[in-house]
């Protein structure tokens, strides 16, 4: 299973993406989430996801 990590500063959008996709049915494991790039960076280094879904414009550190 590929591990997916989500980075999105808008809580409603983040929850919508996280909760409305049947990750396991599509062969993915949802391994974590963060509200901005600064919080996400150490988590991504620790969790080593295969895929990162990220917003581009976020406070502190953008998705690029």
List the predicted regions and their residue ranges.
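Non-catalytic signal-transmission and effector/linker regions of two-component phosphorelay proteins
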Residues: 1-3
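Conserved sequence signature across two-component system core domains
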Residues: 7-8, 34-35, 52
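Acidic catalytic/metal-coordinating carboxylates
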Residues: 36-39, 62
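Conserved catalytic motifs of ABC-family nucleotide-binding domains
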Residues: 48
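Active-site residues of response regulator receiver
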Residues: 55
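Receiver (REC) domain active-site loop signature in two-component systems and cognate sites
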Residues: 58
């Amino acid at each position: 299973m590929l591990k997916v990590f989500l980075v999105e500063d808008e809580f409603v959008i983040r929850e919508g993406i996280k909760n409305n996709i049947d990750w396991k049915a599509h062969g993915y494991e949802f391994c974590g989430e963060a509200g901005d790039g600064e919080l996400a960076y150490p988590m991504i280094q620790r969790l080593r996801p295969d895929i990162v879904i990220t917003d581009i414009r976020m406070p502190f550190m953008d998705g690029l």
